[in-house]
């Protein structure tokens, strides 16, 4: 099987998995009037000529906003395989342009999506055993202590472990400096699901009992998927997005917030298809001859 045959087989198996589970495949715009407000992700800004006027548009960093607008209207399980774009990303596992699988399950939570992902990984790789641990447990395993709750104590941890940081960095930035050291050790004996993120890292996940109902999937130290139980309260969504928009000086999509007025309870997940395909081929870096321009 050559590279093109392998891709054709792989992508059809992924698509068949969701079709057989009753998901509806959708297609949404790549070019948006407003950027995704994903923390730590830089959107690609473009200028276009529309109806004779120069306008600023944004290439989506994920299809989340458009898919949730569909969810609020149709209230059914949906999935999409699409190209997404993230500025200033290049490396062994990063490209500015890459394929993303995203799906939403109505009436379900993040634990349901974890079970679905287990089934997909079993179908593609034959995996039968999985590990599910909390972020707190992962920190204790790697650093010998739990997650520091203050900036000062997080800096002390980083200093003790010889991890570089800047004095002016906030808690979230400091956390991810430590988290990089944790994640590179995950998923070597079996795929690892890291669950229950600190509330401060909730993104648009529902928060219960002091933590975000959110997970990430790792295989061989590579992050493959990120999912959560969706926060459906429009006022809570507005509060979080306004905070992020102000911090990054980016415009806010009011229609996206309004869509949450009719949003069903659901859970959503995004998965890096190019990374998963590379692992499917037995590679631990992106198959560059297939994904480069």
Swiss-Prot record:
Taxonomy, superkingdom? Bacteria
Q: Which Pfam families match?
A: tRNA-synt_2 (PF00152)
- Cross-referenced Gene3D superfamilies: Bira Bifunctional Protein, Domain 2
Please name the GO terms of the biological process aspect recorded for this protein, alphabetically: lysyl-tRNA aminoacylation
Annotated ATP binding lies at 86-88, 223-224, 272
Q: Identify the GO cellular component terms for this protein.
A: cytoplasm
Q: Which UniProt keywords apply?
A: ATP-binding, Ligase, Nucleotide-binding
The molecular function terms in GO held by this entry are: ATP binding; lysine-tRNA ligase activity; tRNA binding
Family label: Belongs to the class-II aminoacyl-tRNA synthetase family. EpmA subfamily.
Q: Subunit arrangement?
A: Homodimer.
Name the record gives this protein: Elongation factor P--(R)-beta-lysine ligase homolog
User: Where does this protein come from, organism-wise?
Assistant: Aquifex aeolicus (strain VF5)
